Amino acid sequence: LFIKELITDIRFSQLPCMRKYALLLLLLVNSYLGYPQNNVNNLPQVLLRFDDIGMNHAVNTAIAEVAKTGIPFSASIMFACPWYQEAVDILKQYPNADIGVHLTLTAEWKNYRWGPVTGRSAVPSLVDSLGYFLPSTTAFQQSPYKLEEVEKELSAQIERALGSGLKVSYIDPHMGIALSTPELRALTEKLARKYKLGISTLSEVTYYGESYNDMWGEPVATKKQKFMKVLDNLSSSAPANMVVLHIAHATPEMDAMNDMNSSMMSNNASQHRQTELNMVLSRSFRDQVDKKFKLVTYRDLIKQNGLE
């Protein structure tokens, strides 16, 4: 279109013949050389979702390192955790970060627990005798939780996020709980409609048709191999190939973390999370961006497909 407009421009028509041909040739070459960059839109789309952001300092410094690379990504923040404000302050600096609310109803780490944003007295059916969230999905589902208290607490987490100054795109369930029963799923969908947010899941049943891949349960020794295998087998038909990651720096703080739900993570969560961070920072991953696949976020998917 630009070339056609140029040809009809009176100034172009006044150029000597040879200069016209030279200019047209230059424009065509530039257009050709620019084609691979434009063609990035035809590549499979990969969506990196980083969970548990705001959980502790080691997680926050890890997401800061990812953000500094400039790659687009989605970050699910736990607004019920003590370190959430640091995560907010970090991610405000990076427009490449898309923000989600990691809806939290459990506190799974031994000797490092958190409770409801609303306060223990406001949602007594959601907490243990010490006022903390229950330690596991099973414990939560077997408890006499009240749906109206779940709604009150999750609404408070979303409103804390919306009031943080970050632009929030979506909500997703920590440990899958907020989507784990028909009643909880209906409630989460209600909240998404109320606050005009998308929903990301922790299963293969997704809202935007994105494929689901999770590195969490993979042994440290084979994590990167699995990650690269996912990238070697991307679906071009899916709106996005989502990869859920849990990252952190292997610091003394993270080394002391003990997941009460997983023997694999009970004393090795630090190495798991450092390995997943290393995968995303690796040259072998970074060299494939915009060549083998295009990185997108939930903000992009919502823009492409709408909220419903």
Model-derived segments and spans:
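Boundary/entry segment of secreted carbohydrate-active catalytic domains
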Residues: 39-64
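Catalytic domains of cell-wall/extracellular-matrix polysaccharide-remodeling enzymes
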Residues: 144-236
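Bacterial Sec-dependent N-terminal signal peptides
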Residues: 1-40
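A short alpha/beta connector and helix-capping loop motif
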Residues: 57-81
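Active-site gating loops and adjacent loop-to-helix segments of metal-dependent hydrolytic enzymes
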Residues: 113-140, 258-268
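Structural preference for beta-strand elements that scaffold enzyme active sites
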Residues: 45-47, 72-76, 96-102, 168-172, ...
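Acidic (Asp/Glu)-rich catalytic clusters
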Residues: 63-69, 86-98, 116-128, 163, ...
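C-terminal domain-boundary segment and adjacent tail
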Residues: 199-202, 262-308
